[in-house]
Design a protein with these regions (language model features):
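N-terminal basic/disordered segments at the start of proteins
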Residues: 1-25
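Short glycine-aspartate micro-motif
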Residues: 3-7, 126-130, 198
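Helical "lid/coupling" subdomains associated with nucleotide-phosphate turnover
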Residues: 17, 40-63, 67-71, 79-125, ...
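Beta-strand initiation motifs
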Residues: 23-28, 145-147
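A structural signal for short, well-ordered beta-strand segments
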Residues: 31-35
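Acidic, divalent-metal-coordinating active-site segment for phosphoryl/phosphodiester hydrolysis
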Residues: 134-140
Length: 299
């Protein structure tokens, strides 16, 4: 059985194709588009430009999917980008009519649980975070099971839109962003229990890891970020001359030139809240979790 999963995020729309054999999932194909849908939100609604960007991207993905002869099912899931839009019903109907794809809205709690399920984390207890473009999910798990989830209305793209006046966030803007993140975490009544390790999933975390490995000359397969190293890297980037900063980020992750640093700040503040020493980045997440969940539903 082969399934296609389209993940409609606030910054990136991703297509992944998986081959499912029993309870094993093999990734066959990946494609992405940096649609930045959160940038098209005006007065709580996605404007026509954003809706058209979404529709055009989904048409392109549908065309790619048609190249696979044995696709059993195509799923499209949407997180904060559409979930938080007042005109989400209109968006879903437009996509159904113009593209022929049904979008399934994923709540913040569902998003957190699916990210945990797909992370492949082997620790029995700890914290998992998924930093998206429009929201950040936090999962507290014990004995291998989710015991609490929390969704923060801040992601890398929203942070950039709300706090940065230029291409890069400044020292003063960083302080305002950090204060906002701390207030959001505190308002979610998360117990501040120490966890030495935080697991991170999602595009922001992977981009952060890639920059971290480049800056500290780590091996390509490294998935560990130390808190001291991340703090130093963030401060170095904040104080770095813009041209040098641009050159470094363009080399590593060009499509995240404006959102990478805000995403790193969010990741750091969440991990620091739980007194973590290290962050381990998983290469899998919500899409894999969604497929695993479908396997469980099928029995």
């Amino acid at each position: 059985m082969i399934d296609a999963v389209i993940d409609i995020g606030s910054k990136t729309i991703r297509l992944s194709v998986y081959k499912v054999i029993g309870d094993e999932v093999k990734n066959l194909f990946n494609e992405k588009s940096s649609a930045s849908l959160a940038s098209f939100i005006e007065k709580g609604m996605m404007n026509e430009h954003g809706i058209q960007k979404l529709i055009n991207t989904l048409k392109e993905f549908k065309n790619l999917i048609s190249n696979f002869e044995d696709i059993s099912k195509t799923y499209a899931i949407a997180t904060a980008s559409i979930r938080n839009s007042c005109n989400r019903r209109e968006i879903i109907e437009r996509v159904r009519t113009e593209v022929g794809i049904d979008i399934e809205l994923i709540s913040g709690e569902e998003e957190a649980k699916l990210s945990f399920l797909g992370s492949g984390i082997d620790s029995q207890s700890g914290i998992l975070t998924d930093i998206g473009g429009g929201s950040s999910e936090i999962v507290v798990f014990e004995q291998g099971k989710v015991v609490k989830t929390s969704s923060l209305n801040i992601g890398s793209l929203v942070a950039f839109d709300n706090f940065a006046r230029g291409l890069f966030i400044t020292k003063d803007e960083k302080k305002l962003l950090e204060d906002d993140i701390k207030l959001m975490i505190a308002s979610n009544n998360l117990n501040r229990v120490q966890h030495d390790l935080v697991c991170a999933v999602g595009g922001s975390a992977r981009a952060c890891l890639k920059l971290y490995n480049e800056y500290y000359d780590k091996e390509a397969g490294n998935v560990i970020i130390t808190m001291d190293g991340l703090k130093n890297l963030i401060n170095t980037l904040i104080n770095m001359e813009n041209r040098a900063k641009m050159k470094l980020i363009l080399k590593v992750k060009a499509d995240r030139i404006h959102t990478l640093i805000p995403g790193m700040i969010i990741l750091y503040r969440i991990a620091k809240y739980f007194y973590a020493d290290i962050i381990r980045v998983s290469m899998t997440g919500i899409r894999e979790g969604f497929v695993y969940n479908k396997i469980l539903e099928r029995g």
